[in-house]
Amino acid sequence: MSFVPGHISLTFSIWPDKDPLVMGSTGMGIVLSEGVHCAVINEQSTTNENIIIRKGEKVEDPVTLRAIELLGFNNKGLTIYLRHDLPLGSGFGISGASALAACLELEKDLDLCVKAAHQAEIEFKTGLGDVIAIATSLKNHIFPSIVVRHEPGCNGKTKVYPIDEKFLICISGLGRDTSEILSDKEWVEIINSAALGIQYNDVTIRSAIKAGRLFTEKTGLINKNISEIF
């Protein structure tokens, strides 16, 4: 069974490109200790369809299916079992983590898996840098950690900073739909403008959260419930 940690984006700047492996984001985020567990089994079914099972039920997960297709495992009659430590749709990068976890069950070359999962996320507009940040922590065997993505895309320069302090994560409702934001040119301009001037010199959990708060305030992405209590 493979495990892939989740990721919280704190700041990001969008870098579009026709090549999905080059397209991505720069910015900073936290890679968590919790994430996605995956097992892939060939059930010897009568159909060649690959299916996703979550909490005992078949679910739609086009990103994960596309990722394993890119690895060459389309229509193999595979059953992909996913177990999540973190909730979906709450900003934990579960879409990318699920895709990467499934890929790692089928292919042990991390770089190939990262390319497949990242491209699938780009195609479905569910993420830009989650897979890259997560992969950085996996390669260094460090999580929880803060990952700074200095360059976009699969071959972009990144740097990882271990988190030694204890921290608490609170959730207040569901987050905004990622694909909706990435498809809106006005949002892209707002986000890229807000990311200008953010420095990543002295990276600690406190400075990272402070930068994330400033970024969400400048973009208007901050949850109103959180802004009132934090």
Specify the residue positions occupied by each region the protein language model found.
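Short glycine/serine- and small hydrophobic-enriched flexible loop segments
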Residues: 69, 101-108, 214-217
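Short, contiguous, pocket-lining structural segments
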Residues: 30, 59, 90-98, 186, ...
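Short loop segments at secondary-structure junctions
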Residues: 41-46, 108, 137-138, 175-176
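DPxDG-like acidic metal-binding loop motif
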Residues: 92-112
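Phosphate-handling active-site elements
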Residues: 73-79, 106-119
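ATP-binding N-lobe of GHMP and related small-molecule kinases
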Residues: 1-86
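ATP-dependent small-molecule kinase catalytic core of the GHMP/sugar-kinase superfamily
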Residues: 114-228
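FAD-binding core of FAD-dependent oxidoreductases
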Residues: 9, 14, 25, 29-31, ...
